[in-house]
Amino acid sequence: MKKIVLCALFAAAALVGVTRSQAQVLVIANPSVKATEVSKSDLKDVFTGNATSLKDGSRVVPILLKAGTVHEEFLQAYIGKSDTAYRAGWRSLVFSGQASMPKNLEGDAAVVDFVAHNNGAIGYISKATPHEGVKVLAVK
């Protein structure tokens, strides 16, 4: 019985860790983007290739992190897809000529640098990453 209780406690702790870690992802944008917040549905539309602007009219270009923990957390928290399903969706859009695959960058610092220097760029990074020169968007 003690083993079952301990297993249940460890499983619950793991789930709490996943929820807490999702909050560790920041959505960032170039300062040229007018918005200060973005809805989860707008974010999903932009990062799945279904929109090129936010509801306020700001044109945006999504920038992706290459596979890793922050990328997986972003997809899980805001897109609701696994990396495999997410990339399959983009490949379908690219193959049909409806969109071009977003730029994939290696590491949070590269995303911050690219977003800071490219009008309309929007990306995501770890909350712990220094992010001078970019705007943090609140996700509602």
Language model region names:
Residues 8-11, 21:
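Cleavable N-terminal signal peptides
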Residues 15-23:
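Sec/Tat signal peptide C-region and signal peptidase I cleavage site
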